[in-house]
Amino acid sequence: MTAVIALVGRPNVGKSTFFNRLTRTREALVADLPGLTRDRHYGTAQFEGRQYLVVDTGGFEPEEREGLVAAMAAQTRLAITEADAICFLVDAKEGLSTQDAEIAQELRRGGKPIYLVVNKMDAKGAVSELPEFYRLGLGTPYTISAAHGHGVEPLLEAIFSDLPTSEDDTADAARKGPRIAMLGRPNVGKSTLVNTMLGEKRVLVFDEPGTTRDSIRIPYERQGKPYVMIDTAGMRRRARVGEGLEKLSVLKTLSALREADVVLLVLDARLGIAEQDAHLVGVAVELGRPIVVVVNKWDGMTPEERKAVKQELERRLDFIRYAPVYTISALHGTGVGDLYKSIDQLWIDSRRHFSTAELNRALADVIETHQPPMVGGRRIKLRYCHQGGENPITLVFHGNQLTRLPGTYKRYLESAFRRALHLEAVPLRLVFRQGENPYDPQPKNGRQH
């Protein structure tokens, strides 16, 4: 799984600055998802080729004699229990405080790797305060300037030298077959489905609402084919959790989704689709992961109830109408075997490579059927297409006035290329680049407009 590094410390010690320093060169994992991208307290970063997630837990502010009892918000508790490493930031300019000592005591109880980070070492008079921090009992401090980047690289080297790499047996197995992320709210039958798909009775869990844990990766074989199951903790109802728990749950979900080749979204037919379900789908879509919608507990429902569920699926999940939908009973195994047909096909399709010639033949047919619209008296030109990546399959279009291409025509392109390339069930990512075809031998002044 992608490592999670939590930034902990009292207010105004520079956590946000350090967060920005770590994440400055990386785009957010999710684009345009309300409640996610606007939350600037988490992000993705990279160090020496290893991607990781970083979360700013906010500041501790113990209140009078209650100490950390009141100040330890859900987000910070989750940082301690779910992070792989904790960077405990203190302020070299202000020196050691009572709050620092209280935080250090609480962090030690968590048993996670703690890196004491003395920030603002570039401040005047900071060096004279450094010896104080040894009294926290957390070993030799790492001195940095989050604002200017001094000392950050040695700190990250220390953290990642202690963290295990993901290149283990599970990763080796995953390269031979699909990695399946099992997502869903608690009590929808997710763990029962995992057990049924694995073909054995085993406890995977701690799946009760409110319980938090790391995702579990389970390599296994079915009919001679290798798979890896990534079982994540279920998403919680917002009313039952604090902001921080929701945040860390999202982090773990993002981590699982980054690793997955195929995502199974498990729904309870009797509970319908909650906001968290649609939210999970949105995350998977933004990451470009193929999705299979699995409607569990289908047995025992009346025809009228089944019709209502199908209508709700069409309405709430309209933006992934390409995704296959299966109705199953995880408890009795009904329909579970059919899931593998889609899993295997989606894994193959999402990794396909198309030649540039094939894509441009398809583009010519698509344009002949329906030309781009006229804008300002000139027709938008789609001149050239090539593949820019896989999982998700990314198609890069070059042409003129592409910034003015309407959304309706972009949707037409997506559906038309799905049909032409026989990619009906996997996400397609379309990228539009303004300019000339770099592979066209004709000079620019020989263009026909």
Swiss-Prot record:
<dbReference type="InterPro" id="IPR005225">
    <property type="entry name" value="Small_GTP-bd"/>
</dbReference>
<feature type="domain" description="EngA-type G 1">
    <location>
        <begin position="3"/>
        <end position="167"/>
    </location>
</feature>
<comment type="subunit">
    <text>Associates with the 50S ribosomal subunit.</text>
</comment>
<feature type="binding site">
    <location>
        <begin position="119"/>
        <end position="122"/>
    </location>
    <ligand>
        <name>GTP 1</name>
    </ligand>
</feature>
<dbReference type="Pfam" id="PF14714">
    <property type="entry name" value="KH_dom-like"/>
</dbReference>
<dbReference type="InterPro" id="IPR016484">
    <property type="entry name" value="GTPase_Der"/>
</dbReference>
<feature type="binding site">
    <location>
        <begin position="231"/>
        <end position="235"/>
    </location>
    <ligand>
        <name>GTP 2</name>
    </ligand>
</feature>
<dbReference type="Pfam" id="PF01926">
    <property type="entry name" value="MMR_HSR1"/>
</dbReference>
<keyword id="KW-0342">GTP-binding</keyword>
<feature type="binding site">
    <location>
        <begin position="296"/>
        <end position="299"/>
    </location>
    <ligand>
        <name>GTP 2</name>
    </ligand>
</feature>
<dbReference type="InterPro" id="IPR031166">
    <property type="entry name" value="G_ENGA"/>
</dbReference>
<feature type="domain" description="EngA-type G 2">
    <location>
        <begin position="178"/>
        <end position="351"/>
    </location>
</feature>
<keyword id="KW-0677">Repeat</keyword>
<dbReference type="InterPro" id="IPR027417">
    <property type="entry name" value="P-loop_NTPase"/>
</dbReference>
<keyword id="KW-0547">Nucleotide-binding</keyword>
<comment type="similarity">
    <text>Belongs to the TRAFAC class TrmE-Era-EngA-EngB-Septin-like GTPase superfamily. EngA (Der) GTPase family.</text>
</comment>
<comment type="function">
    <text>GTPase that plays an essential role in the late steps of ribosome biogenesis.</text>
</comment>
<dbReference type="InterPro" id="IPR006073">
    <property type="entry name" value="GTP-bd"/>
</dbReference>
<feature type="binding site">
    <location>
        <begin position="56"/>
        <end position="60"/>
    </location>
    <ligand>
        <name>GTP 1</name>
    </ligand>
</feature>
<dbReference type="GO" id="GO:0005525">
    <property type="term" value="F:GTP binding"/>
</dbReference>
<dbReference type="GO" id="GO:0043022">
    <property type="term" value="F:ribosome binding"/>
</dbReference>
<feature type="binding site">
    <location>
        <begin position="184"/>
        <end position="191"/>
    </location>
    <ligand>
        <name>GTP 2</name>
    </ligand>
</feature>
<feature type="domain" description="KH-like">
    <location>
        <begin position="352"/>
        <end position="436"/>
    </location>
</feature>
<keyword id="KW-0690">Ribosome biogenesis</keyword>
<feature type="binding site">
    <location>
        <begin position="9"/>
        <end position="16"/>
    </location>
    <ligand>
        <name>GTP 1</name>
    </ligand>
</feature>
<dbReference type="InterPro" id="IPR015946">
    <property type="entry name" value="KH_dom-like_a/b"/>
</dbReference>
<dbReference type="InterPro" id="IPR032859">
    <property type="entry name" value="KH_dom-like"/>
</dbReference>
<dbReference type="GO" id="GO:0042254">
    <property type="term" value="P:ribosome biogenesis"/>
</dbReference>
<protein>
    <recommendedName>
        <fullName>GTPase Der</fullName>
    </recommendedName>
</protein>
